[in-house]
């Protein structure tokens, strides 16, 4: 009797789910929140994952138990649905970064927090960092990043390649338009900044002279160079 009542309640609550999707975060909004709440991971990497996971919708919920994907416009209603389904022992992927409910306790998340952009991004960054092994070269770091992304999706360093998830994130990263930043007033400083490299940051350069795209391994920076806002990033941008 209890199970039937619970199933009916779930069906009724699902019926109140808005047919129109919640407004996703804009690229500027996402960039702002990611830099504030998850500064240790490259914003573009988090954006690529968010695009694949939720299409930047902080109120997206995927019920792995029933196979439903729900989108809400009201945070309170979405929180109630998450709590109700967790009480029914469902496995849920919740919020902007689609954090699985099994990880809530480990990450210090609540249903309310998981549906907010800042806690979701912070949790995602912690999960990626915990799975990122690093490396000696840029290529090794890129491989380690992709393995961390695989583990983010599957809990395994290999299965995310086999199921196509890593490739989806790579494709999403390539399709995202970089954020427009304020150009430095001093052209000389701008040129110097382009040559700056930090092992914890990200570095990409495309040859304009030859018209050929590709990453070029940079030289280490001078010790006098100032640090940018990205110098504390642990994970590289995908390239």
Swiss-Prot record:
Residues 202-232 are annotated as: Disordered. SUPFAM superfamilies: Lysozyme-like. It comes from the Bacteria. The keyword Signal applies. Residues 1-28 form the signal peptide. Disulfide bonds: none annotated. InterPro entries: Lysozyme-like_dom_sf, Transglycosylase_SLT_dom_1. Keywords: Crown gall tumor, Plasmid, Signal. VirB proteins are suggested to act at the bacterial surface and there play an important role in directing T-DNA transfer to plant cells. Belongs to the virb1 family. This is Protein virB1. It comes from Rhizobium radiobacter (Agrobacterium tumefaciens).
